[in-house]
A protein has these predicted regions:
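Beta-strand-enriched cores of mature, soluble protein domains
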Residues: 19-140
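N-terminal signal peptide c-region/cleavage motif recognized by signal peptidases
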Residues: 13-15
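Positively charged n-region of N-terminal signal peptides that target proteins for export
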Residues: 1-4
Length: 140
């Protein structure tokens, strides 16, 4: 009984010190239209899109979608973003995972921005309607 109680307390202490990712107060939407899609080999796809990114202004995105583990209907991506609002410009590196869900692709990403923000992103890539839209939030 003493051993069982010690084990339970041990595991509870790990849980209580675990880290959480907290969404920031500045959540915003990014709405883009797909400008181009292409592939060189039929396995890796590259997409570019442009649109509006809230306070970041006009945004241009480029993505490289892969499935390194060759899993059906899911994989990973990397990319780059460039945004401008007036004279201010920002850049971001994009990295995340994708999963096909019906006729769209669901994307989850953790991005690093030159203004010092780390962003958590969830989005929908709709190839039929040529849209790529996201909800973005700073990580606290």
């Amino acid at each position: 009984m003493k051993y069982l109680l010690s084990t339970i307390i041990f595991f509870i202490s790990f849980i209580s010190f675990s880290q959480d990712i907290n969404f920031g107060d500045g959540e915003f939407e990014v709405k883009t239209n797909i400008d181009a899609v292409y592939t060189d080999d039929g396995d890796t796809y590259k997409i570019s899109s442009s649109g509006d990114a809230g306070d970041y202004g006009k945004v241009y995105l480029s993505y490289k979608f892969t499935s390194i583990l060759d899993t059906d209907g899911q994989g990973e991506f990397t990319g780059f973003a460039w945004a401008q609002q007036g004279e201010e410009t920002q850049q971001a590196t994009l990295q995340g995972v994708w999963k096909k869900q019906g006729n769209v692709f669901i994307l989850y990403s953790l991005d690093s921005v030159t203004d010092g923000n780390l962003m958590m992103v969830s989005g929908v890539l709709d190839m039929v309607n040529q849209t790529l839209n996201f909800k973005v939030s700073p990580i606290q």
